[in-house]
Amino acid sequence: MSHLRIAVTFLCTLFALTAGAGESCQVGGSAIPVGKTKQELCNLYECATDSNRVVLKKLTCAEQAVKTGCRSVPGDANAPFPDCCPTTLCRGRQWDH
């Protein structure tokens, strides 16, 4: 019985280590291997596995609701994510930047 337990443990470990091996996500004609990221304009893509499925995660700037006394300042369009995203500056804190 202990040999069976060792064999099952070995196979489960091997499967966990090879999940997603050789697989990739497609983004605009290029492939991102599982476990890697790709920077593109103001987006960051990550190819990952989730419950034995290959998934593509995309991070991009969120729209912000600007409160009274604050203003939105555009980010540098040539900067990598998240430095390309706009920031919110408010009176009394960072207004004079």
Curated annotation (Swiss-Prot):
Record localization: Secreted
Tissue distribution is: Expressed by the venom gland.
Keyword line: Disulfide bond, Secreted, Signal, Toxin
- What are the boundaries of the signal sequence? 1-20
**What happens to this protein after translation, modification-wise?**
Contains 4 disulfide bonds.
Q: Which InterPro entries does the entry link to? A: SVWC_dom (IPR029277)
Q: Name a GO CC annotation attached to this entry.
A: extracellular region
Q: Which GO terms describe its molecular function?
A: toxin activity
> Which SMART domains does its entry note?
SVWC (SM01318)
Question: What family name appears in the similarity comment?
Answer: Belongs to the scorpion La1-like peptide family.
Q: What else is known?
A: Negative results: this recombinant protein is not able to act on sodium channels (Nav).
Name this polypeptide is given: Venom peptide HsVx1
